[in-house]
Amino acid sequence: MTNSRETHLLMKIINHSFIELPTPSNISAWWNFGSLLGACLMIQILTGLFLAMHYISDTMTAFSSVAHICRDVNYGWLIRNMHANGASMFFMCLYLHIGRGIYYGSYLYKETWNIGVVLLFAVMATAFVGYVLPWGQMSFWGATVITNLLSAIPYIGTSLVEWIWGGFSVDKATLTRFFAFHFILPFIILALVIVHLLFLHETGSNNPSGINPDSDKIPFHPYYTIKDILGLFMMAFTLVMLALFSPDMLGDPDNFSPANPLNTPPHIKPEWYFLFAYAILRSIPNKLGGVLALLASILILLIIPLLHTSTQRSLMFRPISQSLFWILTANLFILTWIGGQPVEQPYIIIGQTASILYFMIIILLMPLAGMIENHMLKPKW
């Protein structure tokens, strides 16, 4: 008798995607982050749905409605803390997932990689509009500063900003539309995730060695489902610990004050996961130049496949490129630290140096290292 998962139309898709999927036998724990991101997305959609049932997107009541959720709604405090810290977990997994892709050369699956970059933009947009919703001081001023950057676009800039605001400043219309965007974007992300997986399953997964794994594949279930469940438990444990013991550790104290357009906070800064990009934005004194550098810092991921010069796919056997990769990682930590510091010396010069190094490693040094390693591997006779 044929198993229903092999004949039923829907079950067949699930079977070929998650059960009998041929998977390289040597993929490491770094391949766990895809499933963890899926779990994060589900957590965010569910907690967000329950928050949306009680949240009011009006400038007069938004801040109070969040306080009401935390005080009066059954387990509202937990749902809110899980949602706020779930975003941090999402970005941690996202950056590790991208780092894995760069280290092991997964970017050579160009369609999967490009959809992934689009996903990154969508997640960043969702997080940004979501941060505005509690209508605290940092929410309001963050929205004002970041949306104002669009005014740097020549000719249409000012009109574009006022169109996004729905008026001449960040106000009720802005909050209402940001709530609408924040509600719809996760479902767009969900659709993009399916496309991402569709392209991935066309080629199959990459593996740490970077060589063709077709000769040695095993079914996804039970081997990798068990491995993914372990990762899921570890992530869930970290998230619950964060939400229960230090829920405000990654937030900004300014956001405990209701939004006040007449009082600017001394240091306007985004959440920690945007600080590296914010540091790159601030490192250029010109407004338009800063905006272009900000966009380039993410869009640069799209040209990484074009900059691959090595005959080997992975960095596993390439010590020079490995060193550069870890310098790039350290550089991103420095940029994150600088993004949270005031605009004064020595932070300005450190931020500018780190920004130049960021682009230099990706555009110049990594391709150069690949060429040098190719030359070193040539037989000497």
Curated annotation (Swiss-Prot):
Identify the residues that bind a ubiquinone: H201
Membrane topology listed for this record = Multi-pass membrane protein
Transmembrane ranges, per UniProt, are 33-53, 77-98, 113-133, 178-198, 226-246, 288-308, 320-340, 347-367
Q: Which residues bind heme b b562?
A: H83, H182
Gene Ontology MF: a single term: metal ion binding
- Paste the cofactor note: Binds 2 heme b groups non-covalently.
Q: Where mainly located?
A: mitochondrion
Query: What keywords tag this UniProt record?
Result: Electron transport, Heme, Iron, Membrane, Metal-binding, Mitochondrion, Mitochondrion inner membrane, Respiratory chain, Transmembrane, Transmembrane helix, Transport, Ubiquinone
GO BP terms: mitochondrial electron transport, ubiquinol to cytochrome c
Q: Which Gene3D superfamilies match?
A: Cytochrome Bc1 Complex, Chain C (1.20.810.10)
Q: Which cofactor does it need?
A: heme b
Which N-terminal stretch is annotated as signal sequence? none
Q: Where in the cell is it found?
A: Mitochondrion inner membrane
InterPro entries in alphabetical order: Cyt_b/b6_C, Cyt_b/b6_C_sf, Cyt_b/b6_N, Cytb/b6-like_sf, Cytochrome_b, Cytochrome_b_C_euk/bac, Cytochrome_b_N_euk/bac, Di-haem_cyt_TM
The chain's coiled-coil residues are none
A single GO cellular-component term on record = respiratory chain complex III
Question: Which family does the entry's similarity section mention?
Answer: Belongs to the cytochrome b family.
Q: What does this protein do?
A: Component of the ubiquinol-cytochrome c reductase complex (complex III or cytochrome b-c1 complex) that is part of the mitochondrial respiratory chain. The b-c1 complex mediates electron transfer from ubiquinol to cytochrome c. Contributes to the generation of a proton gradient across the mitochondrial membrane that is then used for ATP synthesis.
What name does the UniProt record give this protein?
Answer: Cytochrome b
Q: Which organism is it from?
A: Caenolestes fuliginosus
The organism's taxonomy opens as: Eukaryota, Metazoa, Chordata, Craniata, Vertebrata
* Gene designation per UniProt: MT-CYB
